[in-house]
A protein has these predicted regions:
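Bacterial N-terminal signal peptides that target proteins for export
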Residues: 1-8
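Hydrophobic helical h-region of N-terminal Sec-dependent signal peptides
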Residues: 9-13
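C-terminal motif of bacterial Sec signal peptides marking the signal peptidase cleavage site
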Residues: 15-18
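Bacterial signal peptide processing site
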Residues: 20-23
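Terminal, regulation- and interaction-focused segments at domain boundaries
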Residues: 29-61, 69
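A cross-family detector of function-defining hotspots
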Residues: 63-103
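Amphipathic N-proximal alpha-helical interface segments
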Residues: 89-123
Length: 125
């Protein structure tokens, strides 16, 4: 009976390890981020976004850029704050992996008030 249980582990490992990309997208926003600490990576991404989208920039352009860089925009209904949004990218497995989250706040006219980038782990159970 024990030898048969080993075969159950193989599909489980494939499912857990094969569902997410293995690294950050090869796009300008993420150049040089991997290999740094999460804090340093967050600073790199934050600096690039702040330089490209200073206060008063178009949220529509920010969203388009984030999608071009490989992030997914969360549906607006999921945000608890009006005129805010979140984009994300997760990789290296659904259980214990890494992620980039970019959140922003906008004014009623649809211009950026603030942007916050976080590069970190997804947390392990």
């Amino acid at each position: 009976m024990m030898p048969n249980r080993r075969w159950l582990i193989v599909p489980l490992l494939i499912v857990l390890g094969g569902c997410e990309p293995s690294g950050l997208p090869a796009t300008p926003l993420f150049v040089g981020v991997e290999g740094h600490s999460y804090a340093q990576g967050s600073e790199l991404i934050q600096g690039r976004l702040s330089a490209r989208f200073p206060t008063g920039s178009s949220v529509r352009e920010l969203k388009g850029y984030l999608e071009q860089q490989g992030l997914q925009i969360e549906p607006t209904g999921r945000s608890s704050t009006p005129n805010s949004g979140v984009a994300f990218f997760k990789y290296n497995g659904p259980v214990c992996g890494s992620q980039v989250r970019v959140s922003w706040e906008a004014d009623a006219a649809g211009t950026v008030k603030s942007i916050h980038a976080l590069y970190g782990d997804t947390g392990c159970p």
